[in-house]
Amino acid sequence: LAFDDDKNTRYGVRKEDECGPVLNTGMFFAMKEMGDVMGTFVGHEHVNDYIVDYHGIALAYGHFSGWRTTYTREINGVRVVLLKEGQREFDTWLHSLDGAIRDRVTYPTAFIND
């Protein structure tokens, strides 16, 4: 839902559908209610590596970090997250095994739509 909504700023790629749970446990609502959650970082969708702002919370995938799958030729790497002490802000980017860095953004600054 978050990635599909053109109003939501996003960086990175989506190459396969997300596998959300069948049961809505209210986790996202609880994070919103807490008021101090800036983002959540997940993996498993092997070739998704995007970050999107959804109602003031960054939803971010890591990067393909395993080794060889039967259906992708993606080079492995990681999502780096650099928290800024005392600020409600973080930097994040994708760093591939070959040294390439892409989609370097500062949250929430890069996601503010004027």
Identify the residue ranges that each predicted region occupies.
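Histidine-centered catalytic micro-motifs
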Residues: T40-N48
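Metal-dependent phosphoester/phosphodiester hydrolase catalytic core
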Residues: L1-G12
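Binuclear metal-dependent phosphoesterase catalytic core
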Residues: R10-C19, T25-M34, N48-D114
